[in-house]
């Protein structure tokens, strides 16, 4: 080190320090790679394996999402299945849910999983349902835990700001697990560093906490304000990007409890099975109007009602159930558990990939052949050539 400005500095101590720090970092990296955890005293400290970010479309110009709805995983082999045929019951446990999950990941090879997917090393995100806090953890603790798990891109809540009496202050958002994820264009394209598909995740709550209103919870006004802010921010980023004149990037939304308007889909030409009443809040908080006015959301993906797996359209926005996935949750004997797949496809330009051309969906059944059913186009870019 050099303390006298008149003397020539000796760089060797600094160089030695840098080499030492590099050695420590390399050692920790090797330990993490081999063992996945460090030990401090007698306690194992796990290091999160992070997903590769940003999420982006692959070289084939696609981005595939697996929606795992209502897994209801309990205690492994000790948890018996519900609503299966008599000959299936004696051997059916939570392990059937795990096996279905592994087989569907191998079959579909998704780029992203909406719920949970640590073993597959695929980026994943989770939203809370109405049962998740019924054990020893609060909803906030659960989302904190989920966000710290390997390959998770889940977030507890965003930091957002508002103004009160002319002063900028942090604005609280209801619920836990409200966040958005941006998916970038394919590597090598002019949109490689731009968000061209956006995913909104919302906490739809548990039971109503408002006196005089019974039933399920709902997406609150603070969450909808945040949604509108994010939507406008994405719009502003597009205007400043390399392709400001292209169609606004589409968005998809994920939350658990359906909104009241989903009941109206019984009277439409829905695709799939509508087998039980829509278990929604008795209070309508205006989510549908918010989504319509935002203009970017093309489809919403729901859970909660396990034997509904239909898609129906409301004011230009598709609402799709995932269908019950887990064997410990209720279902219907003889009706296979299922999973929803969502595929976004890019438009092919003269030299490279452009923006999103089409979004479609289908379901896979947990039968002998993972049957593919009810394929449906949800949105096509009107400006695609």
Question: What are the roles of these predicted feature ranges?
Answer:
Residues 1-14:
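Short, low-complexity, Lys/Arg-enriched N-terminal segments of secretory-pathway carbohydrate enzymes
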Residues 14-55, 59, 68, 180-184, ...:
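Binuclear metal-dependent phosphoesterase catalytic core
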Residues 30-116:
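N-terminal active-site segment of His-dependent metallophosphoesterases
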Residues 41-57, 117-246, 339-345:
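Extended active-site neighborhood of metal-dependent phosphoesterases/phosphodiesterases
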Residues 70, 129-130, 304:
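Active-site glycine-centered loops adjacent to acidic/histidine catalytic or metal-binding residues
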Residues 71-98, 210-218, 270-276, 330-334:
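Acidic/histidine-rich helix-loop elements
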Residues 109-112, 192-194, 198-201, 209-312:
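His/acidic metal-ligating clusters that form di-metal
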């Amino acid at each position: 080190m050099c303390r006298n400005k008149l003397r020539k500095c000796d760089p060797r101590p600094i160089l030695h320090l840098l080499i030492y720090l590099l050695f420590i970092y390399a050692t920790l990296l090797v330990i993490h790679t081999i063992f996945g955890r460090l030990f401090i005293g007698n306690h194992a400290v796990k290091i999160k394996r992070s997903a590769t970010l940003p999420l982006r479309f692959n070289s084939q110009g696609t981005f595939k999402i697996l929606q795992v709805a209502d897994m209801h995983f309990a205690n492994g082999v000790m948890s018996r299945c519900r609503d299966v045929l008599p000959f299936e019951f004696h051997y059916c446990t939570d392990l059937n849910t795990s096996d279905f999950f592994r087989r569907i990941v191998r079959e579909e090879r998704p780029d992203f999983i909406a719920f949970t997917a640590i073993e597959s090393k695929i980026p994943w995100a989770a939203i809370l349902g109405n049962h998740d806090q019924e054990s020893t953890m609060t909803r906030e603790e659960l989302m904190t835990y989920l966000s710290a798990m390997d390959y998770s891109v889940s977030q507890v809540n965003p930091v957002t700001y508002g103004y009160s009496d002319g002063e900028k202050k942090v604005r609280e958002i209801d619920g836990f697990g409200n966040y958005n994820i941006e998916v970038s264009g394919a590597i090598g394209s002019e949109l490689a560093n731009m968000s061209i598909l956006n995913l909104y995740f919302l906490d739809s709550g548990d039971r109503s906490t408002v006196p005089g209103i019974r039933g399920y919870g709902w997406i609150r006004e603070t969450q909808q304000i945040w949604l509108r802010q994010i939507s406008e921010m994405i719009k502003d980023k597009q205007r400043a990007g390399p392709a400001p004149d292209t169609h606004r990037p589409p968005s998809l939304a994920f939350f658990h409890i359906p909104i009241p308007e989903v009941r109206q889909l019984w009277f439409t030409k829905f695709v799939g099975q509508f087998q039980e009443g829509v278990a929604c809040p008795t209070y309508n908080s205006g989510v549908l109007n918010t989504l319509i006015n935002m203009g970017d959301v093309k489809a919403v993906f729901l859970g909660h009602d396990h034997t509904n797996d239909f898609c129906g359209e409301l004011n230009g926005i598709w609402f799709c159930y995932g269908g019950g996935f887990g064997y410990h949750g209720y279902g219907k004997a003889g009706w296979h558990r299922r999973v929803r797949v969502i595929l976004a496809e890019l438009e092919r330009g003269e030299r490279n990939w452009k923006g999103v051309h089409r979004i479609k969906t289908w379901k896979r059944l947990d039968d002998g052949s993972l049957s593919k059913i009810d394929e449906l186009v949800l949105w096509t870019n009107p400006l695609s050539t």
